[in-house]
Amino acid sequence: MGVGQSTELPGHVGTPEHLSHVLAERFATKCFTPLELTHFKDNFFSRAIDQGGLKYWNEKILSDFLGIPDSSDSHCPLDAGPVIFRMVSYLGAFPFQNTLAPSVLTFEAMVKVAVLLTERYGRVLRRGRKDRIKLLFGSLADVGRRNVSTSPDTEDVCRETDDTVKPHVTGFEVDAPANDDYGDEDEDEDDDDLALAALESLDAIDVFKHDSRVDKKVYEARISVATLRRLLMLFLVIAPLKTLEPVTLYTSDLNEARMESIRKEADTILAAFSTEDSDGGISYRSFANITSTALPYLFDPLTPLFEHLLFSKNLDMTKKSRSDATVTDTIEKPSDSPGPSPSTIVLPGGFESSILKPSVVSHLSFFLPSPTSNANLLRGNMRLHPVFSTAVHGSSLTSFSHNVLTWNAGTLLLLEGAVSESSEHGEGMVTLGAYLPQPWKSAPLSHSSTKPSDSSALPCLFELSPKHQLLQGNPSPSVQKPNAPVAYFSTSTGIAIGCQIPPPSRSQLLTPTPLGAGSLTVDTSLESATFYMSSIGHNGVFLPPATTSMSEETVRKQIDIYTMEIWGLVPDPSDTSSSDLSRQSPVELQRAKWEFEAREAERRRNLNLKAGAGDPAAEGARWLLETAGLIGDRPGQRGGSL
């Protein structure tokens, strides 16, 4: 790993160290621009420790550069530095983790780390995200270094190579201006695939496959709960981090109350990972299942964190000289002046949330997509506009209808309460929610005709606490039925999400019934809710949660509601590039509807309904009100759905 340039010495080509170096060169040319490599080299070499010509980073340098709190800090509520260093040391040995990990953090190792953690692996990993999950598990699991037997010939070759090559890292030849050998865009991509496939076959990139080649010791490895908890707490703090934002913007105000909220949220996420059959640790099967289905954006904070490597404050690109850039002799010291306050996804409005704490928003970003893109909620330039809250607007369906049914955009429903004593699960606080990317409809028993083409357009039902559970939307067209809307509202039965709506009846009041794997119903007083979840059922709006095993029974929780909030999903008002300025925003449309309702209410007050039978004015007025659906008792006239 300390070889600075590619060599073609006889017998040296097949060694893991040399192949790892060649792969690092390929990573650099395929995944970074020349300008990014220039910044990367400056960041690395200006801070690297030089020991006998070998330049590398240690844990302290890595933590200080990234701004991650570690045990060296006097006040250290987040001790995530050792966890990140452990991950980086493992990933730096890719694709020979079993033989070379933990690796010394040379420039070559850091190049591979940056590619893998900034999600630039599309051109070097054939299975992309699936391979990344395996690598992330290995970087966190307690896997020992494998003893590799080498033949005497190989030992002699390595000894000769060590005598002829100086152990120093000077960067890659391809970083020089003349990098035509590796930078040709017309290079045969098939050769790359074959080369990378050969590299994969030499080590454990497919170590978790269920076949005879599986390394049992690695497969049976576990991630300790303490290790994952420290990493989750870091992610909950830096989840809103944007590219090139200083991490201290989010780690400088970690008071006791904030840390308590972060610990609580981390424990609810940890509860999703099954540890019963893993000797107290988290198995690969559980890790892969949860991170790919229930927490698909969990590791997204690593991308902006490690993108700091690709921008150096020491490079003054405004000054031109013979070289392309000018590098200062000293490292720029961070300013002591307070920086800007971190941005928030919650827009100011009619109320302040009692549920959407910063740690809860971070938790939501680990699995909720942006309605306009496949990025997570915090990365998709979306904001949450306050629409309805029982704490402010009261527990009234009339108020709910006035505020929610007039909102012409997607919504996020959040509910917090206590599980009633009558419930089979006893007492305890619970936080539930529903992500509804389509607007509510006021037409009775109507169903959106939109056929979602991606996951961001699908609804989902979730439990945030005491255990993270996600019921994803069912993409099957067969579940799109008029009597099975995603969300339904009625002044007679209340709110129903993921239920089957019964036909209207004059003789009795029929309530919505659960359909499929999950549902949520709220009564007409907005004071009680019922949460239903099953490990089976693919005929409804929601699919079974990944965290539920087939042996678990159906869960039904009766909840006494403390607070229920509805948040509207709107584009970032400050982002004018993605919005159509000629189009009215959902806030403006809602305000226009309210003004129209106010005018109609004033008009109705002026109608004379006290005239005698057969009065044309009275009949016309009554016809107008019936047409608007404000009076009359025709079946199915009251209610609305999504």
UniProtKB/Swiss-Prot annotation:
<feature type="domain" description="TLDc">
    <location>
        <begin position="354"/>
        <end position="570"/>
    </location>
</feature>
<comment type="function">
    <text>May be involved in a process influencing telomere capping.</text>
</comment>
<keyword id="KW-0963">Cytoplasm</keyword>
<protein>
    <recommendedName>
        <fullName>Restriction of telomere capping protein 5</fullName>
    </recommendedName>
</protein>
<feature type="region of interest" description="Disordered">
    <location>
        <begin position="322"/>
        <end position="343"/>
    </location>
</feature>
<dbReference type="GO" id="GO:0005634">
    <property type="term" value="C:nucleus"/>
</dbReference>
<dbReference type="Pfam" id="PF07534">
    <property type="entry name" value="TLD"/>
</dbReference>
<dbReference type="GO" id="GO:0005737">
    <property type="term" value="C:cytoplasm"/>
</dbReference>
<comment type="similarity">
    <text>Belongs to the RTC5 family.</text>
</comment>
<dbReference type="GO" id="GO:0006979">
    <property type="term" value="P:response to oxidative stress"/>
</dbReference>
<dbReference type="InterPro" id="IPR006571">
    <property type="entry name" value="TLDc_dom"/>
</dbReference>
